[in-house]
Amino acid sequence: MKYSLPHYHLSFIIYHFSLFIFHYSLFISLLLLTSCEKEIEIDYHTVPSLYVVEASVSNTRMEARISRSQNMDDNSTKSDISNAVVVITGDDGSSNQLKYQSNGRYTANSKGVPGVTYTITVDVNDEHFTSTSTMQNKPTISSFRVIRKKIATEWFQIGELNFPDLPNEDNWYFMHIYRNDLGYRWAVLDDRNDPGNERQQLFNFFREGDTGSDVLRDGDNLRIELYTIDKSTYDYFFSMQMMDNTGTNPIPNFTGGCLGYFSAHWLVTQNFVYRAENVEEEE
């Protein structure tokens, strides 16, 4: 069964992926440094048609996308759901019923508050789904650049994202890079091994000399998105990285038996225009 996440503010167009495999074992060290994923469809290891709830509370608004996946032997597209009742409450006493817009999308203009734990309830056709997530504090992007790095005899272009770890608290991060408004690379990161210090995430972009769709072109617009997420959201997306190895779906993020996730997060963005002449070479 396949589904892809929506192209709204959370922008988690996260798909089932294969790891970026290098041609030589010497490249494994670079792979371990980057730990980023390409944008490929999620191939769910389930057969029945299930509801899919993709929802978020952010520093700008609340929203959800609700659909129903199709059986694996059904060639039709997934169906958007327009008759759900979606309510998000906070432990600060807030309550918002999201209003249906179109294409299975529900929204409310309320913003998330750091430290507040939010609960979403979704009622649709006699089924009930719930999930909780705690809003995190605002992250900051220090810098982003593209570098060239030689591995064995070949050159690779790599995205380098730097940001300070938020002090005096446990932190989990989600990073998503868009290329010309389409998902390009993503990664998750925690701070358990080096809390409170500058963090760096590397993204495998492409091997120089390749001609495939991954290759960046002069003038490509990159949008770098950095999210602070809670542990339950981190665990969900980290488990997605393990799908090929375990042969299972991501760990459940909702009660009630639906697919998908609910995330309360703070998002910051930075724009970057790719120019080959500006790519810096590093040892």
Roles of regions detected by a PLM:
Residues 32-35:
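C-terminal motif of bacterial Sec signal peptides marking the signal peptidase cleavage site
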Residues 37-283:
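A sequence/structural signal for flexible, mid-protein segments enriched
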Residues 2-30:
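Short, basic, low-complexity termini and linkers enriched in Ser/Thr/Gly/Pro
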